[in-house]
Amino acid sequence: MNELTPQEIVRELDKYIVGQERAKRCVAIALRNRYRRAKLPKELQDEITPKNILMVGPTGVGKTEIARRLAKLVNAPFVKVEATKFTEVGYVGRDVDSMVRDLVENAISLVKSEYMEKMKERAKALVEDRILEILIPEPHARKAGFKNPFEALFGAPSQEPEQTYQTTDDYIRTQREILREKLRSGELEDKVIEVEVEDTVKPPFEMIMGTISDEMGISFQDVFGSLFPKKKKKKKMTIREAREVLEQEEYNKLIDMDEVIKEAIHRAEQHGIIFIDEIDKIAGRGSGVGPDVSREGVQRDILPIVEGSTVMTKYGPVKTDHILFIAAGAFHVAKVSDLIPELQGRFPVVVELHPLTEEDFKKILTQPKNAITKQYIELMKTEGVNITFTDDAIEAIAKVAVKINEQSENIGARRLHTVVEKIMEDISFEYANVEKPIDVVIDKDYVYSKVSDMIKDKDLNRFII
């Protein structure tokens, strides 16, 4: 876990998110407290639980992005779920335990990728040996009338007597070393070979069992593993394609999945972050019928997971006591007080995110590392087109986005994507594979010429069904 101070965490978040200082401070403190807790004696660690956060603010102000960037910053298991997707036990829909199962899957993927990175060089060497064995089999694996592989590959006649070739291991090694150099130089990438691979098509019964096992948290593959033996089949493919397939097989052999699962469950329990979006949509007692049915029930189902319980997954039991939960909602109609009191108590840190202003929009267009204007500049560079956004163009885009948000639904910073896409549409369509580099300057006049139809007829949408 990265030993970042709260100030360092906020500075990292500032690279991607404009404004919302209090929200960034709160998540930074929550993250640092995990590091502080890890330094305490074991018995005291168990007593300290994370202070879950409830973010309140309209759509498009950065709630989800703050949580997502936070998880990436420390390489922590992270999952985003929609509260509206869950239903009370007994109704059709996803049960709330699935968010923990999803977190474990994410943690396993994270840990496995780290193990793969550590074993990358070893796996590449093993794959290289396997490809050479296919190109030049061992003598006992050869069929009668086998030809010198150099003759098969390059049309060169054999320089050794057949008898000597079939019985001399030194000669085989020499040939393989010569081919190894050609493999590494990329000369043989398009050569077609026959590879024995695992059949990835599962029988229908196994597919059904897989779906059920995910929902029940039971691994039927472990229970009935002998009923589903892995099938092999021979497949022709280029060496380039074979390398990817064989690398995956070698990783599966090299990586101890028991160790991966053990580490993944530990990370999910100690460092996992679950982001529950649209929590305001399940607030309120409702009428108990129609669409309101099970709203309070979902809250009561979420409650034990947030306050700490054990969820059974197909990889084993997972404790949720130290998972950090970040909930978010616009709360336009419902209020935070409409959540059941017990659930409110499990989110002691309530942060209000303010709506974005025109000045914020201008910063969003230019300051973040992943600003949409920067993305388009880099995209069009690949076509030989150098895009420049003038300062008055940035100001115009921000004004237009604010205007449209006022006239219709306010979707926050997401409106900037709509406006910029409209501005860039013709350029993206017309300029492809230009013969020589060209410069395109986007100014205020160009912006207004492209978006004029978006800001006129402001009341027209009320007549559209």
UniProtKB/Swiss-Prot annotation:
It holds the Pfam family AAA_2. SMART domains: AAA, ClpB_D2-small. GO terms for biological process: protein unfolding; proteolysis involved in protein catabolic process. ATP binds at V18, G60, V61, G62, K63, T64, E65, D277, E342, R414. GO terms for molecular function: ATP binding; ATP hydrolysis activity; peptidase activity; proteasome-activating activity. Gene3D superfamilies: 1.10.8.60, DNA helicase RuvA subunit, C-terminal domain (1.10.8.10), P-loop containing nucleotide triphosphate hydrolases (3.40.50.300). Its main location: cytoplasm. Signal peptide: none annotated. It comes from the Bacteria. It is found in: Cytoplasm. One of its GO terms (cellular component) is HslUV protease complex. Keywords: ATP-binding, Chaperone, Cytoplasm, Nucleotide-binding, Stress response. ATPase subunit of a proteasome-like degradation complex; this subunit has chaperone activity. The binding of ATP and its subsequent hydrolysis by HslU are essential for unfolding of protein substrates subsequently hydrolyzed by HslV. HslU recognizes the N-terminal part of its protein substrates and unfolds these before they are guided to HslV for hydrolysis. Belongs to the ClpX chaperone family. HslU subfamily. NCBIfam families: hslU (TIGR00390), PRK05201.1 (NF003544). A double ring-shaped homohexamer of HslV is capped on each side by a ring-shaped HslU homohexamer. The assembly of the HslU/HslV complex is dependent on binding of ATP. This is ATP-dependent protease ATPase subunit HslU. It comes from Caldicellulosiruptor saccharolyticus (strain ATCC 43494 / DSM 8903 / Tp8T 6331).
